[in-house]
Amino acid sequence: MTVPSLLLAGGRWRCFPLPLASSLFQALHNSCCRKESTAPKKIIPHIDFSDETAKESGKTLDKLFSSEQQASILHVLNTASNKELEAFKLLRGKKSFNIVEHRKKFGPFQNLESLMNVPLFQYKITIQVCNSILNPETGGKKKKLQESRLLRKLIKPEIGRERVKAVNSIVSIVSGTRRIAWAHLDRKLAVLDWQQTEYCQLMKGSYLSSVYLEEISSIISKMPKADFYVLEKAGPSFQNPSLFPVLLHFHMTEAMLYALLNTTFAQDGHHQVLSMNRNAVGKHFELMIGDTRTSGKEVVKQLLSESVLKDEPRVFFPPEKIVRYRQMFSSTEHNRVEELYDSLLQAIAFYELAVF
């Protein structure tokens, strides 16, 4: 039996009859379906998956990976259990199950091309799977990625994880409509300073920038030096027009704190002032009821008591200051000075969530 076959001769296509079983026909057929590709020298390929011609060009998987890499990939595919395969992110769910089922029915994979016979495995995903097997995410790498994601949700602006981990002390600052409070803690969770001050005149009059500058500068002069200054990121919604004066006050205060405390930013571009998610602190201390954060007064009261009663309290108040701090707390019990409580809780949460 013969079939027509096309050959390019003298720049024109011509038809020649060839036997179906002819080795020449097979060679020509393979030549038409596959172009030459040069295999990289023992490197993991970085394929542009947006290029739809990758498969059409005939680049077989076996030519994209060295023999050693192929052996490593096949060893995992042929020996790993369903649970072990799910350790690779791209193989979770149905894909790992399908690999195991395919092995049971057809035996071990003989080459990488055979992986595409498994349901859900197309050309692009197969290359990604092979790369992930060669470069699995280690436990340490996963932990770093998780910590980086947490930091992005917890604090703004984004800063290097290494800078956060190396912090020695912070000043946690919480401002309200009438007062501002701060807590200075080191990485041993020792409370080095904790106080509040009032600034009643700021929300009176025309919200003059010069008045804010004078008032906030005076307050900052009382604050201790630290590696980071952590502000509470919160404020009323834009959707309520009646709260616009309060919102304006919060933003002006925040802007002043960012400008006056970021003393080296112009030189090195490094942020020293950060804003921390208020609700994240509330969740950490179980103060949230739905979307509403409740008072942290009782938590602070318990921390003060534990510092005296326990050998290893959660927070350490220096003996020479504990009496003053307890008196300060007692004097605010009737007024519920939330800024004072929140500044301490925010500092503790920063260390426990971002540093430790």
UniProtKB/Swiss-Prot annotation:
Pfam families xrefs: HHH_3 (PF12836)
Query: Which SUPFAM superfamilies does UniProt cross-reference here?
Result: RuvA domain 2-like
One annotated GO biological process = mitochondrial transcription
Keyword Transcription on this protein? yes
Subcellular localization, per the record?
Answer: Mitochondrion matrix; Mitochondrion matrix, Mitochondrion nucleoid
Transit peptide location on this chain: 1-35
Q: Which InterPro entries match?
A: RNaseH_sf, RuvA_2-like, TEFM
Question: Which domain of life, per UniProt?
Answer: Eukaryota
Give the record's GO CC terms.
mitochondrial matrix; mitochondrial nucleoid; ribonucleoprotein complex
Q: Name one GO molecular function term.
A: nucleic acid binding
User: Which key words tag this protein in UniProt?
Assistant: Mitochondrion, Mitochondrion nucleoid, Transcription, Transcription regulation, Transit peptide
For this UniProt entry, what is the primary localization, expressed as one broad class? mitochondrion
- Please give the subunit comment from the record: Interacts with POLRMT.
Write out the function statement from the record: Transcription elongation factor which increases mitochondrial RNA polymerase processivity. Regulates transcription of the mitochondrial genome, including genes important for the oxidative phosphorylation machinery.
Q: Which family does it belong to?
A: Belongs to the TEFM family.
Query: What is the official name of this protein in its record?
Result: Transcription elongation factor, mitochondrial
Q: Upper lineage ranks?
A: Eukaryota, Metazoa, Chordata, Craniata, Vertebrata
